[in-house]
């Protein structure tokens, strides 16, 4: 079994993707942006997980040599890509774009969904005990869901998973700034370098500790690479 483990596990994820397709064969036609968000957070994210785990198995299978199975598995990859990229991402992406277009055009965000820029005020400022915030750049929601499941199993503790709408544009320097305490974020272009300011202060990694301490002197920001 060990020799064929990656093939079996890859096929399991294909089966999961096919089952998801059957459950949602009518496509994605949710009429409300908030509901699309809710559906993804509670259900649709599973397709991203299946896709990631399939490719993990596929990449590992390439470390062993089995000419017949390798060729067959590569044909499976084509089917998986069609199902994921065309049907899932294409269909769900269109549904989301259609239902949020008006609000995005008028406000630059969907109003009824929690905003990343409110993170500090909603989750840190009201806390009555010590809070640790770990920021992992570009970590997908479905990976967080898998991590939450693993923490529940290993620690037998209560783990709550939530989501917030990213600031726009959704790039690192804006997202990191949005998590800091602020009343207003502004962008500044100086010597062809774009900076994000929180109430006029730089939010570069070297200054985040200062921004935090300006609100709570007991705060500390640490960077790891």
For each predicted feature, which ranges?
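Conserved structural scaffold segments of CAZyme catalytic domains across common CAZy folds
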Residues: 74, 78-95, 140-141
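Charged, low-complexity, helix/coiled-coil-prone segments
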Residues: 24-31, 86-91, 202-218
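Non-catalytic accessory regions outside enzyme or core folds
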Residues: 1-84
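Active-site nucleophile/metal-coordination loop of metallo-enzymes that catalyze phosphate/sulfate
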Residues: 2, 110-127, 141-221
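Conserved small/polar residues in nucleotide/adenosyl-binding loops
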Residues: 225
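Charged, flexible boundary elements
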Residues: 89-122
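Short hydrophobic beta-strand that contains or immediately precedes a catalytic carboxylate
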Residues: 131-136
